[in-house]
Amino acid sequence: MRSCKTAATIAGALIVSISGTSMAWSEDKKETAATTTTRPAPVPTVTQEMLSGAATDTKNNLHTNLNYDQTRYYKGKQINKSNVGKLRPSWIFQTEVVESLETTPIVVDGVMYVTTSFNHVYAIDAKTGEQFWHYKHKMGPVTTYCCGPNNRGVAIHKDKVYMGTLDAKLVALDAKTGSLIWETQIADPELGYSETMAPTAVDGKILIGTNGGEYGIRGFVRAYDAETGKLVWNFHTIPENSVGVWATHDATGKDMHRDIAAEKAALKKLGDPYKTLGGGVWQNPAVDLKTKRVFFVVGNPSPDLDGSIRPGDNLYTDSLVAVDLDTGKYVCHMQYIAHD
């Protein structure tokens, strides 16, 4: 295994507020999927050239973190030190979901795509706050999703927007009307898998990881065909040999005071715990278009509070991992903390 040592508002002076209303979230709403289209959203086809050049695009926000480098750096100068103190709310948009919002809007030619908890998607006029369309996902029987019902946003590619769902699906919607085009089951939600991260669109593929590290899942990052929803590749964030090198120091050189002898005895007794070791990925990967590499950070091992039953370094938890964009093949990794 190789080590990774290095890795490489929009519509003007506008402040907006998007919030929930007092409408309760009921079971019948979870079981009903529907798209309400007030009028089609006037959006252009979002090309790969546009997505690749997002870092210098001061008109749109085409990625959750503004660009493939995930820097959140915006080069526009319309809002600056001299006028930021004068900004005032321009409009308020009320959703029908009473939960927190942890989403980043995607903005294309003045059309703002916003997600809410429990997998609603709204297309909104960024200038007026008026709704173009509203999609409600039909939720399956989910009882084990981790850490709340939040959703962190959509990806956009050509004429579609993409969202991961709490019941571990990837859905593709018509960017103009919100109509469901296809949906793909990513994993079994009853085994603890769920989706809250925003997908990433690149080179005709939709990249997405998974939640569920607290439920003993085996984490992954997967690529799906943007047109059909078919699986292109799968990378397990926990390899079949998760033991590693029995590291005694973390990435900063600090002694972790591991009892290696006790861990090796546990390995002999319990075996490699790779099938239930966790390793979720819920933040967007960085993409290097020149080298065709995808970089992502893998989360905690499972169970997170009892390391005695997961001997070894617990690869690739608590690590930065790089894979090939076209194939999903392992390139390198750097583990910050072994056996966390």
Model-derived segments and spans:
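Bacterial N-terminal signal peptides that target proteins for export
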Residues: 1-11
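Bacterial N-terminal signal peptides
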Residues: 10-20
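Boundary at the C-terminal end of the N-terminal hydrophobic targeting segment
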Residues: 22-26
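Blade/loop signatures of beta-propeller domains
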Residues: 30-89, 247-260
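Repeat-blade elements of multi-bladed beta-propeller folds
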Residues: 61-65, 100-120, 145-169, 194-218, ...
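Beta-propeller domains
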Residues: 76-86, 116-137, 312, 325
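Extracytoplasmic beta-rich repeat domains
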Residues: 93-104, 134-155, 183-198, 236-284, ...
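Short loop/turn segments that connect beta-strands within beta-propeller blades
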Residues: 125-128, 174-177, 226-228, 325-327
